[in-house]
């Protein structure tokens, strides 16, 4: 018997209703369903799950992807609300795609994920993230100083609101808001981006996917670590963490007719193009 787990946005009634309808449909097909905790943790009974379905937006999807990574199964995003980069299908098309997963004919796309581990002075379980790992300032009115090493080589010490290490999937999320580059998901890399750095150099680094990034909290202010916005961990001054590609990539269920990544970028950010009435501005030099 197939078993499908659900992670739902509890604050959206349409998401709750959609999840209940999908669960009823699955049960009528003879499948078992389980509602996973909203934080993306695993079923209390430890039973295996064949698919995790998120019903909501990209934030809900990230929690579902976290659970799916531990369960070793794919994750499918049913979009409710605003368009995102991760949710894949409208509620009306969800049953067809779920059926394809359970019979083994669905298209599965592997996405690089991240893991962060404690080093000297830090104490927390290793964390997994699909989008990003972030170390930010603890006090709102203070900056945090973070020394950056890549593969053992010292790079710089950022005095900033924080530092993000993102995957290509996460390059359109918080890293983008911090002026990081957009990287297509098939180009595996680590993207290191400072947040509002108070120094002349405030640009991102795009690193080899096999790189290991270490961040050390310097100065007098502690930092706060999180992965994909989940529960934060305080990092005292002098503590270090290591961030690298995870050995457990995310497995995303995709539609065969899904739009390409750059088409999503154009739609999401409203980029101008041939369909626009206005002529593009001249950007060449005068004369």
Predicted stretch roles:
Residues 54-58, 65-67:
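N-terminal glycine-rich "phosphate-gripper" loop used for MgATP/nucleotide binding
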Residues 148, 170, 225:
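Short aromatic-centered micro-motifs
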Residues 1-51, 55, 92-107, 118-127:
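ATP/NTP phosphate-donor binding region
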Residues 11, 57-60, 83, 169-171:
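Short glycine-rich anion-binding loops that position phosphate/pyrophosphate groups of nucleotides
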Residues 135, 140, 151-154, 203-287:
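ATP/nucleoside-binding phosphotransfer catalytic cores, i.e., glycine-rich phosphate-binding loops
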Residues 72-74:
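Proline-centered loop/turn at the N-terminus of a beta-strand
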Residues 85-162:
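Catalytic core of DAGKc-family lipid kinases
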Residues 157-201:
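Gly/Ser/Thr-rich active-site loops/lids in small-molecule metabolic enzymes
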């Amino acid at each position: 018997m197939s078993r499908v787990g659900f992670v739902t946005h509890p604050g959206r009634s349409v998401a709750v209703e959609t999840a209940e309808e999908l669960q009823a449909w699955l049960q009528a097909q003879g499948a078992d369903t389980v509602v996973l905790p909203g934080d993306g943790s695993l079923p209390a009974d430890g039973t295996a799950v064949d698919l995790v379905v998120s019903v909501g937006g990209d934030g809900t999807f990230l929690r579902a992807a976290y659970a799916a990574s531990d369960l070793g199964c794919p994750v499918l995003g049913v979009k409710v609300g605003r368009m995102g980069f991760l949710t894949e299908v409208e509620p009306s098309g969800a049953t067809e795609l779920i059926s394809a997963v359970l019979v083994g004919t669905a298209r599965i796309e592997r996405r690089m994920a991240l893991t962060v581990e404690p080093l000297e002075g830090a104490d927390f379980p290793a964390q997994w993230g699909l989008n990003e790992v972030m170390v930010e300032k603890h006090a709102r009115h203070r900056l945090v100083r973070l020394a950056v090493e890549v593969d053992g080589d010292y790079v710089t010490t950022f005095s900033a609101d924080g530092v993000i290490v993102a995957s290509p999937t996460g390059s359109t999320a918080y890293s983008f808001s911090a002026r990081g580059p957009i990287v297509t998901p098939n180009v595996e890399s680590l993207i290191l981006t400072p947040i509002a750095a108070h120094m002349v150099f405030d640009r991102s680094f795009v690193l080899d996917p096999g790189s290991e990034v270490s961040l050390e909290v310097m100065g007098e202010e502690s930092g706060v670590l999180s992965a994909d916005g989940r529960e934060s961990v305080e990092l005292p001054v002098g503590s270090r963490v290591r961030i690298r590609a995870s050995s457990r990539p995310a497995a995303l269920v995709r539609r065969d007719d899904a739009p390409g990544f750059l088409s999503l970028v154009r739609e999401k950010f409203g980029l101008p193009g041939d369909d626009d009435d206005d002529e593009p501005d001249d950007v060449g030099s005068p004369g």
